[in-house]
């Protein structure tokens, strides 16, 4: 895992098209903004895991 330090208002780049900007810090919460192309999905981890779980349920158990 790459660990970076950023201050409010500073941005980091992921590839050529995705930016992540620190918008604010209050207590133990950090607000970030993500700029990404429309074809790149951006989700909080818990939402992503729910989506993956729902996909697995739609496919049903696999028999071999």
From Swiss-Prot:
GO biological process: mRNA catabolic process; negative regulation of translational initiation; positive regulation of translational initiation; regulation of carbohydrate metabolic process
A family per Pfam: CsrA
One GO cellular component term: cytosol
Tagged with keyword ATP-binding: no
Subcellular location, record wording: Cytoplasm
Annotated keywords: Activator, Cytoplasm, Repressor, RNA-binding, Translation regulation
Example GO molecular function: mRNA 5'-UTR binding
Protein family according to the UniProt entry: Belongs to the CsrA/RsmA family.
HAMAP family, alphabetized: CsrA
Subunit structure: Homodimer; the beta-strands of each monomer intercalate to form a hydrophobic core, while the alpha-helices form wings that extend away from the core.
Function statement: A key translational regulator that binds mRNA to regulate translation initiation and/or mRNA stability. Mediates global changes in gene expression, shifting from rapid growth to stress survival by linking envelope stress, the stringent response and the catabolite repression systems. Usually binds in the 5'-UTR; binding at or near the Shine-Dalgarno sequence prevents ribosome-binding, repressing translation, binding elsewhere in the 5'-UTR can activate translation and/or stabilize the mRNA. Its function is antagonized by small RNA(s).
NCBIfam families (UniProt xref): csrA, PRK01712.1
Name assigned to this protein: Translational regulator CsrA
Gene: csrA
